[in-house]
C-alpha cells in the first residue's frame, strides 16, 4: 500500500488551460525528446563562489503560449557535476530521453527548459539557482513517422521561466527584445514521434513528461542495460478481479449522516434569509460509487459507476435468502444502523500484480436542487442536479492470497485524492482515538477474488461467519448510539454479473436469452424473437421480478419465482440523454408448447382444417417442434425433389383472459417470406369453438374463417392457407443453398392486427428450421405462438413521499404483455419440378473467392459472335432484328420508318372511326379513276415512285453510315468480352463479401494500373490490416503485400504498379446498406389476394439483381482486364423489431441499450485488447444513428434520430450493429417502424373524466367511418358507432379520458373507413395523469384460494344540504365490483356502498381506489382500500 501512496503523492499535475480543454481533441500522439548536451557556461560570475559542490540540472515544463499557462508536470534530469576547465568551452553530456503524449497538437504548445545550478555551501546549506532558460518549439514542423527527427540547438536566455508570465511578453518569439541572450551557450536536442507510446497511454496521464527510467506500474522494466522502459514499452499481464457484497457504513448512522449532510448543503445553496424556496429544498437524488483500478498515476480504465442504495430500500424491494435468515434482534438493529449496499458483482479485468496498483472507491452523492434558488424568477417545473464527492478509499490487493474479505476506512477532507475534487469534511480528529477515527470516517466492506469466479463462490460460504465477526469487532468500538453494524450477506442468486445501471440505462436481452414461463419451473433456453413478460401471466397482485416495469436500476437476472417483489424505481443518472434509453426486448419466439387442455386440443383438431399432403397424396410427416434439428446441407442439396412448396396455415387464435379488454371480431396478418412480396392477408373472422359440454368449453379459443365482401362467412375449410413454390425456375444459379440456409437460420415474424380498428394486437415469431425435409417427401409442424405487444410508458416516481417534488426522474418503462396465442401449421412439400430442366452446359458459380482472368467464366469464346449461353453451335439460334428497332436515333432519321409510324397511326385512328375510313376509301377510288383518265396524273405517280426510291437510297446510306460508326464500338465490345471475368455475389444487408481477383500484366513492360469501379458499394481493400482480417475470416491462402496500392489525393481511385508479366491478387469488398424501405399498408389487403387465385404464383419482390463493372486500365488508357460482378441480393436476418408511435412532423429521438458485448450472439471469446467498440450503420442515409460507450464493462447505447412525416405515414428502416472494427458481419440487425400520428395532450386526474374534441376533416368522397381506441376502458369516443363523414367537411369527434392509474401513458385512436377498411386518420393521445387526493383509507385481509369472493360495505355521507346522485368507479375492475354503479343520497344522510372482491389464488397486496363522482363526473372523494391476500 505504501508503494501506491508514494507514487500517488508524487503524481500531481497541472491541467491545460480551460479554454484549451474546450477544443475538440485530436488523436493521441506520442513523442520522444532527447536532451543531448549543454554547451557553454550559462552561469554568471560569482555564482560558484564559496560553494563546495556545484552540479547542474535541467528542468522541462510544457507551456501554452496562447494562454500563457504552464501545465503538466516539471521533469527533472539527473544532476551533473560542473567542471570548469580554463581556456576550454564547458560541455556537459546528458543524453536523457523524455517521453510524453498529447492531443494538443498546436504550434503554440512549447517546452520550456530551465538550467538550474545546485550548490552546497561550506556551512552545509543547499541552494538552487536558476541560470537561464530556453523555449523549444515542438510542433512547428510536422513529423510523420518515427524516422522523422527534428533536431537543433536551443538558445538560452538569462533569467527564470517565470518571466514568460509577464504581461509585456505577449509573444515568446520576441524574447530578444526583453531578455538577454547567453552567448556561446546552447542545448543540443532532438524531437521525434514515438508511435508505440500511445499503446501504454492508459498507464500515465496526458501531457506529463516522464523519463524512461521512472517507475510506471503496469509497464515492464527494460530488458537491456539502458534502463529505458518506454523506448519499446511492454504492458504487464493483467489479472481479472471480482468484487462482491460491497457495503458502506457511515458514522454514526446513515440516516444521521445524510441528515447533517443535507442540512449543510441546504445552508450553502439556499438563500441565507430563507431555508427553502417555494416549499422545496436540496435533497439527495442518488448515491453513486465509482470503482476503478489506479496505478498511482491515473485510473487504468474509466471507473465503473454503480448506484448504491440503503439497505432498507433494498429489503423493501427484494426478499433475499440471507435477509430471511436474520433473527428478530438483528432486524431491530438494522433499522437504526443502515448500510449502503450494492447487489451487483463488479468485474475488473485491468488489475496487475504490482504493489503500485490499487483498488479505489469514490463515494459520490447527487443532490437535487430547485432551479429557482439563485434566480429572481424561480421555476417550479424542474430542478438541477449537483454532484459532490463524499468519501474515498484505496487498497492494494495481494494476488497471492487469491480471495479475501476486506474492510477499509473511508477518507475525506481537503486532501489530494484520485478524483481531483474536494471531498466532504471528516469528523474532528482531536476527539477520538485512532481506532475510533477509522470508524468515524466510515468503512467499506467487500469480498475480493482474483483470477476466477470459482474462488468467489467458495468465499461466499464463509460470508455469514465473516459478517458475524464484523459485528463482533464493532462491539468493541464506542459509538454514540451503541448500536451494532447490521449483517449484510447476499446469496449467490442475488448477485448480477456486471455493474449496476441507472434507470436510464435499461438492459436489453440478447438474441437467445433464458426465460422462464409461468407454467414451468425449469429454465428454458429458447431461441426466440419476442420476450414475454411475467406480467402477462395474470398474476394480478403478485409482485413479479422485472415484470411490469424494467425501469429498475438493476434487473435481477437470476429471479425465476413469481412471488418475489419488484424493487423500487430509482432516479436517473445525471447527464443522461433527454431521450432515455429503452430496453431492446428482443424479437424472441415464444413457447411452441401448447397450453390448451386436452379437451380444447381435441375440439381444435376436430375442425376440418385442410391437410398438408405430399406428392403421393399422403399426409406429410409430423415433426415435433421441441426436437433439435440436425441440418445437413449436402443431404438437402442431394434431394431429387427440387421443388419446395412452403405451406403456411393460420388455424386459430386463443385470447388471454382479461375482463377489461374488448376483443376484436376479426384479425389479419402481415409478414414476408424469403424474397417474396410482403403479404397482408384478408380479414379473418374469429369463431368460438363449439362444445356440448359447458364444463369443458373453452370460450377463449377461436377458429379463423374467411369472410366474403358482404361480411358473411365464406364456405369451405376454416383457416387461411398460403403456398409458396420455390422451384429451380424461381431460384437463380447457386441460390438453392442460400434458401436452405434461410430456412435453417431465419425466423418468420408475423404481426397480428385488429381487423376493425386496424390497431396492432401484437407480434409473433416462429423458427423455420423444422421445414428442412432432410430427404423426406414432406414435413409439417404445428406451433402455438405467443402474441406479444410491447408498451413504452412513463411511471410516476414518488421520492420521499413528495409527489410534486422538483427533479424527480420519470424514466420510460417498458412493458411486455402476452395478448394471446396463435395456432398455426407450417409444411414443406417436396415436388419434382413442373418443367424438365435442360442439362446445364455451364457449371454453376464456383464457391471460390479467388477469380482468375481465364478460367472458363469469361464471356467470349474464340471470337464467336454468339452469346455464351451454349457451347454447342448447332443448337445456337439467332433471331434477326430491325436496326430501327434497336436504335431510336436511327429510327428518327429514316424516312421509311416515319412512314410506317404514320401508317400505323392512321390505321389506329381509322379503326376507331369506321365512317371516316369509308369516306377516305371512296375518295381514294375517285382519285384513282381520275388519274387513269388524266396523263398528267400518271406522270405525277411516276415522280412519286422516283421520290420513294430516292428516299430508300437515302435510308440505305444512313444505315451504312450507322454501321460504320457503330462498328468500332461493336468490335471493342466483343474484344472486351475476351478479357471479361464474371463473378456472382450473394449479398445480404450489412454483410461484407470478400473476394480476390487475380490480375496479370499481359505486356512486356511495366504499367501503373488504375482500378475504376462504377458502384460505391464495391471497393478495393487498400488497408493491409483489413485485408489480412478478411483473409483469416474466409481462410483464403494468397500472398499479402504491404503498401500495395496508391490513392491519389482528392480521389478514391486506387492505382497499382505492375511489372512486366507480373500477377497479383486484388482484394475486393462488397457491402451495401441500401434496402427497400417501402412499408406495408395499414389495412387488410383482401382485393389483391383475390386477384391471385393461386397464391403459389407470387413473384419475387424488388430485390432485383444488378451488375457492377470493374475496369483495369493502364496509364495510357488500355484495358487489360474487366471484372463483372453480378449482385444477387438475399433476405437478411432481423433479430429485433421496434415499432414506435410518434407525433407527426417532429423528430423521434430514441436511445436503445445493448447488454455487454460478450453476451451478444456471435461475439468472439477472449478478444485481446479489451472490449471492442460498437459500431452502427443505418440503411437510410437521412436518419442519424450513432453509438455511445458508457464505460468499461457497461453496456452501450444506440441513438437514433428520425424525422417524422405527416400522419398516418409509416417509415421503415434497418440498423446493423457491429463489434468487428472492419464491419465484416453484423451481430444484430434491427428493423424499426416509425408511425407518424397526430398528437393530442391530455392532463387529468385518476378516475375523473376529462373531455375534449378532435376536428375531423372529410376527404374527397363520402365515407362511413368509426373511431377505435387502443384502451377502450380508459378512452371513450362520441359517437361510439358508425357515422358519416361528409366530403371536404369538418366534424367534431368528442373523446372522454378516464385513466385508471397515475403516470404518463400513450393511447392510440384510429378513424377507420368501415366499408373499405382503410385508415382515415390516427392520433397519439399523450395522457399525463396525477393521483387524486385520498380522503379515506381502509385495509382488509382476504384469504387466498377458493372460488367465491368476499362482500364488504363502506359508508358514505352526503355533506351537501340537497339530494345528490353519485356514480362509482374503480381502477381495478378485475378485483372489485360494485353492487350498484349509481346511488342517490339525501341531504346529510349516509349510504352503504356494497363491494364485492374477486377471489385470488396467489398471495400479495394490492391498493384499490374507489372514485365517487358527481353527476357531472367530477371526483367528489376517493377511497383507498389496501387488500392483503394471505
From Swiss-Prot:
One cellular component term from this protein's GO annotations in UniProt: cytoplasm
Region Disordered, annotated ranges: 828-857
Region (Sufficient for basal bodies localization): 824-1430
Keywords: Cell projection, Cytoplasm, Cytoskeleton
Protein origin, superkingdom: Eukaryota
Compartments it resides in: Cytoplasm, Cytoskeleton, Cilium basal body
Tagged with keyword Cytoplasm: yes
Swiss-Prot/TrEMBL GO biological process terms: negative regulation of canonical Wnt signaling pathway; protein localization to ciliary transition zone
Presence of keyword Phosphoprotein: no
Disulfide bonds: none
PANTHER family associated with the record: NEPHROCYSTIN-4
Family listed: Belongs to the NPHP4 family.
Function statement: Involved in the organization of apical junctions. Required for building functional cilia. Involved in the organization of the subapical actin network in multiciliated epithelial cells. Seems to recruit int to basal bodies of motile cilia which subsequently interacts with actin-modifying proteins such as daam1. May down-regulate the canonical Wnt pathway and promote the Wnt-PCP pathway. Acts as a negative regulator of the hippo pathway.
The protein's name: Nephrocystin-4
Organism: Xenopus laevis (African clawed frog)
Amino acid at each position: 500500500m505504501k508503494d501506491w501512496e508514494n507514487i500517488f503523492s508524487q503524481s500531481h499535475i497541472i491541467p491545460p488551460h480551460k479554454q484549451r480543454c474546450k477544443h475538440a481533441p485530436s488523436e493521441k500522439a506520442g513523442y520522444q525528446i532527447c536532451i543531448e548536451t549543454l554547451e557553454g557556461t550559462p552561469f554568471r560570475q560569482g555564482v560558484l563562489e564559496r560553494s563546495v559542490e556545484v552540479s547542474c540540472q535541467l528542468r522541462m515544463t510544457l507551456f501554452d503560449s496562447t494562454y500563457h499557462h504552464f501545465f503538466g508536470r516539471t521533469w527533472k534530469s539527473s544532476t551533473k557535476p560542473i567542471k570548469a576547465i580554463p581556456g576550454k568551452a564547458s560541455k556537459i553530456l546528458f543524453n536523457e530521453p523524455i517521453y510524453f503524449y498529447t492531443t494538443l497538437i498546436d504550434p503554440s504548445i512549447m517546452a520550456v527548459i530551465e538550467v538550474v545550478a545546485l550548490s552546497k555551501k561550506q556551512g552545509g546549506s543547499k541552494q538552487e539557482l536558476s541560470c537561464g532558460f530556453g523555449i523549444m518549439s515542438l510542433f512547428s514542423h510536422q513529423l510523420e513517422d518515427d524516422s522523422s527527427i527534428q533536431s537543433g540547438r536551443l538558445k538560452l536566455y538569462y533569467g527564470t521561466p517565470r518571466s514568460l508570465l509577464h504581461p509585456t511578453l505577449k509573444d515568446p518569439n520576441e524574447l530578444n527584445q526583453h531578455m538577454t541572450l547567453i552567448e556561446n551557450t546552447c542545448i543540443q536536442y532532438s524531437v521525434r514521434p514515438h508511435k508505440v507510446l500511445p499503446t501504454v497511454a492508459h498507464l500515465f496521464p496526458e501531457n506529463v513528461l516522464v523519463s524512461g527510467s521512472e517507475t510506471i506500474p503496469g509497464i515492464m522494466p527494460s530488458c537491456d542495460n539502458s534502463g529505458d522502459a518506454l523506448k519499446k514499452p511492454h504492458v504487464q499481464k493483467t489479472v481479472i478481479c471480482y468484487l462482491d457484497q460491497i457495503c458502506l457504513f457511515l458514522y454514526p448512522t446513515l440516516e444521521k449522516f445524510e441528515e447533517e449532510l443535507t442540512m449543510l448543503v441546504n445552508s450553502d445553496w439556499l438563500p441565507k434569509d430563507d431555508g427553502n424556496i417555494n416549499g422545496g429544498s436540496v435533497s439527495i437524488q442518488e448515491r453513486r460509487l465509482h470503482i476503478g483500478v489506479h496505478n498511482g498515476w491515473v485510473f487504468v480504465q474509466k471507473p465503473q459507476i454503480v448506484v448504491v442504495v440503503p439497505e432498507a430500500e433494498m429489503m423493501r424491494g427484494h426478499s433475499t435468502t440471507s435477509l430471511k435468515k436474520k433473527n428478530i434482534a438483528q432486524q431491530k438493529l438494522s433499522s437504526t444502523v443502515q448500510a449502503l449496499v450494492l447487489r451487483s458483482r463488479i468485474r475488473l479485468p485491468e488489475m496487475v500484480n504490482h504493489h503500485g496498483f490499487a483498488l479505489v472507491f469514490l463515494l459520490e452523492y447527487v443532490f437535487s436542487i430547485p432551479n429557482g434558488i439563485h434566480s429572481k424568477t424561480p421555476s417550479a417545473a424542474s430542478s438541477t442536479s449537483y454532484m459532490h464527492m463524499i468519501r474515498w478509499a484505496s487498497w492494494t490487493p495481494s494476488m497471492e492470497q487469491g480471495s479475501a474479505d476486506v474492510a477499509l476506512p473511508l477518507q475525506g477532507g481537503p486532501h489530494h485524492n484520485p478524483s481531483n475534487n474536494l471531498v466532504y469534511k471528516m469528523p474532528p480528529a482531536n476527539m477520538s482515538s485512532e481506532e475510533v477515527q477509522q470508524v468515524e470516517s466510515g468503512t467499506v466492506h467487500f469480498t475480493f477474488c482474483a483470477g476466477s469466479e470459482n474462488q468467489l463462490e467458495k468465499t461466499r460460504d464463509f460470508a455469514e461467519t465473516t459478517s458475524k465477526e464484523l459485528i463482533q469487532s464493532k462491539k468493541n468500538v464506542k459509538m454514540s448510539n451503541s448500536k451494532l453494524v447490521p449483517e449484510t450477506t447476499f446469496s449467490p442468486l442475488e448477485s448480477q454479473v456486471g455493474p449496476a445501471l441507472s434507470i436510464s440505462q435499461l438492459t436489453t436481452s440478447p438474441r437467445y436469452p433464458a426465460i422462464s414461463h409461468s407454467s414451468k419451473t425449469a429454465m428454458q433456453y429458447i431461441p426466440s424473437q419476442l420476450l414475454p413478460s411475467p406480467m402477462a401471466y395474470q398474476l394480478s397482485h403478485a409482485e413479479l421480478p422485472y415484470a411490469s416495469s424494467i425501469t429498475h436500476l438493476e434487473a435481477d437476472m437470476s429471479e425465476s419465482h413469481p412471488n418475489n417483489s419488484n424493487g423500487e424505481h430509482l432516479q436517473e443518472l445525471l447527464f443522461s440523454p433527454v431521450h432515455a434509453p429503452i430496453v431492446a426486448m428482443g424479437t424472441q419466439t415464444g413457447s411452441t408448447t401448447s397450453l390448451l387442455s386436452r379437451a380444447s386440443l381435441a375440439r381444435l383438431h376436430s375442425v376440418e382444417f385442410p391437410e398438408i399432403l405430399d406428392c403421393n397424396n399422403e399426409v406429410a410427416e409430423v415433426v415435433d417442434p421441441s426436437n433439435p434439428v440436425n441440418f445437413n446441407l449436402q443431404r438437402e442439396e442431394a434431394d431429387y425433389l427440387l421443388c419446395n412448396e412452403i405451406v403456411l396455415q393460420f388455424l386459430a387464435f386463443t385470447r388471454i383472459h382479461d375482463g377489461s379488454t374488448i376483443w376484436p371480431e376479426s384479425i389479419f396478418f402481415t409478414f414476408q417470406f424469403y424474397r417474396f412480396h410482403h403479404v397482408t392477408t384478408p380479414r379473418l373472422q374469429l369463431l368460438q369453438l363449439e362444445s356440448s359440454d359447458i364444463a369443458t368449453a373453452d370460450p377463449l379459443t377461436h377458429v379463423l374463417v374467411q369472410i366474403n365482401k358482404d361480411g358473411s362467412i365464406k364456405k369451405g375449410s376454416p383457416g387461411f392457407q398460403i403456398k409458396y413454390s420455390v422451384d429451380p425456375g424461381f431460384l437463380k444459379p447457386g441460390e438453392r443453398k442460400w434458401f436452405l440456409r434461410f430456412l435453417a437460420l431465419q425466423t418468420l415474424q408475423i404481426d397480428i392486427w385488429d381487423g376493425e380498428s386496424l390497431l396492432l394486437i401484437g407480434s409473433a415469431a416462429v423458427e423455420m428450421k423444422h421445414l428442412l425435409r432432410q430427404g423426406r417427401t414432406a414435413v409439417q409442424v404445428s406451433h402455438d405462438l405467443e402474441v406479444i405487444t410491447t408498451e413504452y410508458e412513463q411511471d410516476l416516481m414518488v421520492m420521499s413521499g413528495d409527489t410534486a417534488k422538483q427533479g424527480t426522474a420519470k424514466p420510460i418503462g417498458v412493458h411486455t404483455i402476452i395478448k394471446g396465442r396463435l395456432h398455426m401449421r407450417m409444411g414443406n412439400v417436396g415436388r419434382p419440378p413442373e418443367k424438365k430442366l435442360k442439362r446445364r452446359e455451364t457449371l454453376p458459380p464456383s464457391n471460390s473467392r479467388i477469380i482468375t482472368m481465364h478460367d472458363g467464366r469469361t464471356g467470349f469464346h474464340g471470337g464467336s459472335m454468339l452469346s455464351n449461353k451454349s457451347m454447342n453451335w448447332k443448337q445456337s439460334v439467332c433471331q434477326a432484328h430491325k436496326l430501327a428497332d434497336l436504335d431510336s436515333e436511327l429510327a428518327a432519321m429514316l424516312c421509311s420508318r416515319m412512314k410506317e409510324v404514320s401508317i400505323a397511326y392512321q390505321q389506329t385512328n381509322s379503326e376507331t372511326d369506321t365512317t371516316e375510313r369509308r369516306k377516305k376509301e371512296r375518295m381514294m377510288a375517285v382519285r384513282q379513276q381520275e388519274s387513269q383518265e388524266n396523263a398528267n396524273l400518271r406522270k405525277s405517280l411516276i415522280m412519286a415512285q422516283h421520290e420513294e426510291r430516292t428516299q430508300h437510297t437515302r435510308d440505305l446510306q444512313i444505315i451504312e453510315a450507322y454501321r460504320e460508326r457503330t462498328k468500332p464500338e461493336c468490335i471493342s465490345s466483343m474484344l472486351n468480352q475476351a478479357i471479361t471475368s464474371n463473378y456472382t455475389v450473394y449479398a445480404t444487408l450489412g454483410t461484407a463479401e470478400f473476394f480476390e481477383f487475380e490480375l496479370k500484366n499481359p505486356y512486356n513492360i511495366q504499367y501503373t494500373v488504375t482500378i475504376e469501379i462504377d458502384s460505391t458499394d464495391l471497393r478495393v481493400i487498400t488497408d493491409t490490416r483489413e485485408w489480412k482480417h478478411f483473409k483469416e475470416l474466409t481462410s483464403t491462402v494468397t500472398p499479402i503485400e504491404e503498401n500495395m496500392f496508391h490513392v491519389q489525393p482528392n480521389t478514391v481511385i486506387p492505382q497499382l504498379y505492375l511489372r512486366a508479366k507480373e500477377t497479383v491478387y486484388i482484394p475486393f469488398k462488397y457491402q451495401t446498406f441500401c434496402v427497400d424501405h417501402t412499408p406495408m399498408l395499414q389495412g387488410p389487403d383482401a382485393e389483391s389476394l383475390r386477384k391471385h387465385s393461386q397464391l403459389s404464383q407470387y413473384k419475387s419482390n424488388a430485390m432485383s439483381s444488378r451488375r457492377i463493372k470493374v475496369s483495369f486500365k493502364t496509364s495510357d488508357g488500355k484495358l487489360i482486364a474487366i471484372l463483372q460482378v453480378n449482385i444477387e441480393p438475399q433476405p437478411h436476418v432481423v433479430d429485433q423489431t421496434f415499432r414506435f408511435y410518434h407525433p407527426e412532423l417532429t423528430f423521434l429521438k430514441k436511445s436503445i441499450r445493448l447488454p455487454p458485448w460478450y453476451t451478444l450472439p456471435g461475439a468472439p471469446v477472449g478478444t485481446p485488447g479489451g472490449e471492442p467498440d460498437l459500431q452502427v450503420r443505418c440503411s437510410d442515409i437521412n436518419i442519424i444513428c450513432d453509438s455511445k460507450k458508457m464505460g468499461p464493462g457497461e453496456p452501450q447505447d444506440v441513438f437514433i434520430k428520425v424525422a417524422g412525416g405527416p400522419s398516418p405515414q409509416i417509415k421503415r428502416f434497418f440498423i446493423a450493429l457491429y463489434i468487428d472494427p472492419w464491419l465484416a458481419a453484423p451481430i444484430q440487425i434491427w428493423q424499426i417502424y416509425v408511425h407518424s400520428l397526430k398528437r393530442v395532450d391530455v392532463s387529468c386526474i385518476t378516475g375523473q373524466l376529462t373531455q375534449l374534441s378532435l376536428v375531423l376533416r372529410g376527404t374527397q368522397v363520402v365515407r362511413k367511418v368509426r373511431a377505435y381506441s387502443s384502451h377502450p376502458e380508459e378512452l371513450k369516443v362520441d359517437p361510439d358507432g358508425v357515422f358519416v363523414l361528409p366530403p371536404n367537411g369538418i366534424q367534431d369527434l368528442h373523446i372522454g379520458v378516464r385513466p385508471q392509474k397515475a403516470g404518463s401513458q400513450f393511447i392510440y385512436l384510429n378513424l377507420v373507413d368501415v366499408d373499405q377498411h382503410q385508415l382515415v386518420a390516427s392520433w397519439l393521445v399523450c395522457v399525463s395523469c396525477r393521483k387524486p387526493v385520498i380522503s379515506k383509507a381502509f385495509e382488509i385481509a382476504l384469504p387466498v384460494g377458493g372460488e367465491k369472493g368476499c362482500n364488504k360495505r363502506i359508508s358514505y355521507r352526503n355533506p351537501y344540504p340537497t339530494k345528490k346522485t353519485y356514480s362509482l368507479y374503480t381502477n381495478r375492475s378485475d378485483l372489485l365490483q360494485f353492487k350498484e354503479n349509481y346511488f342517490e343520497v339525501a341531504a346529510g344522510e349516509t349510504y352503504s356502498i356494497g363491494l364485492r372482491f374477486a377471489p385470488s389464488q396467489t398471495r400479495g397486496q394490492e391498493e384499490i381506489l374507489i372514485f365517487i363522482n358527481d353527476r357531472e363526473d367530477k371526483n367528489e372523494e376517493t377511497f383507498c382500500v389496501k387488500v392483503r391476500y394471505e
